[in-house]
């Protein structure tokens, strides 16, 4: 599960670093922003690399590491929010929300979903073990028509073939566990995919 969570944060950090550099420049140019605030924006962008390293090294079975990761999530997400100069930027807000949703999902999987995850692994659930909501092949595809079809297929199977994760999690754990899992992963789906989950119960 950590593999695709890492893919998701790479998506956020790519957006954040590309966009963040321009934010920092705009903060410096804005008439009501000080140079200090502009450099603080640049520092936020530079912290993305450190944040990515923490994710790569994170042992989701180590509660102390997860707690430290949770603290760094809050600190990182608040980085741009502390800058009070200039108008609120919708793109900046979107990236902050993506980071928050991602962090919530990682902490949820490591803490709240840990027992259910263990049950599914002990059961050797094929659906759970083969679950790959962000297939690598999508990024590697250069043909736009094929890529569009792959994205549609990824959305259709986001919770496993024929929505099999709902059945697996509900039967092995509970409906409450399924709803928590569903809600957290819908929250991070818009990082790499644009899916319509209105019919997912």
UniProtKB/Swiss-Prot annotation:
First-listed, main subcellular location of the protein, grouped into a coarse class: membrane
Keyword match Kinase: no
Protein name: UPF0376 protein F10G2.1
TM stretches of this protein: 4-24
PANTHER family in alphabetical order: DUF19 DOMAIN-CONTAINING PROTEIN-RELATED, DUF19 DOMAIN-CONTAINING PROTEIN-RELATED-RELATED
Residue ranges that the UniProt entry lists as topological domain Extracellular: 25-201
Coiled-coil stretches noted in the UniProt entry, renumbered to this chain: none
Glycosylation sites: 32, 124
Membrane topology classification: Single-pass type II membrane protein
Cytoplasmic side: 1-3
Gene Ontology CC: membrane
Compartments in which it is found: Membrane
Sorted UniProt keywords: Glycoprotein, Membrane, Signal-anchor, Transmembrane, Transmembrane helix
Family: Belongs to the UPF0376 family.
Organism field: Caenorhabditis elegans
């Amino acid at each position: 599960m950590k593999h695709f969570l890492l893919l998701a944060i790479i998506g956020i950090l790519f957006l954040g670093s590309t966009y963040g550099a321009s934010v920092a420049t705009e903060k410096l140019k804005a008439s009501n922003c000080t140079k200090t605030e502009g450099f603080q924006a640049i520092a936020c962008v530079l912290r993305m690399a450190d944040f990515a390293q923490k994710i790569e090294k994170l042992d989701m079975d180590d509660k102390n590491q997860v707690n430290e990761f949770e603290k760094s999530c809050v600190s990182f997400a608040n980085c741009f929010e502390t800058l009070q100069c200039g108008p609120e930027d919708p793109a900046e807000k979107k990236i902050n929300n993506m980071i928050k949703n991602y962090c919530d999902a990682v902490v949820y999987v490591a803490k709240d979903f840990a027992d259910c995850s263990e049950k599914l692994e002990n059961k050797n659930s094929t659906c759970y073990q083969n679950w790959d909501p962000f297939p690598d092949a999508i990024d590697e595809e250069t043909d736009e028509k094929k890529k569009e079809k792959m994205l549609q297929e990824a959305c259709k199977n986001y919770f496993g073939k024929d929505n099999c994760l709902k059945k697996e999690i509900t039967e092995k754990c509970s409906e409450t566990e399924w709803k928590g899992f569903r809600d957290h992963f819908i929250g991070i789906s818009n990082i790499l995919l644009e899916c319509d989950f209105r019919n997912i119960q």
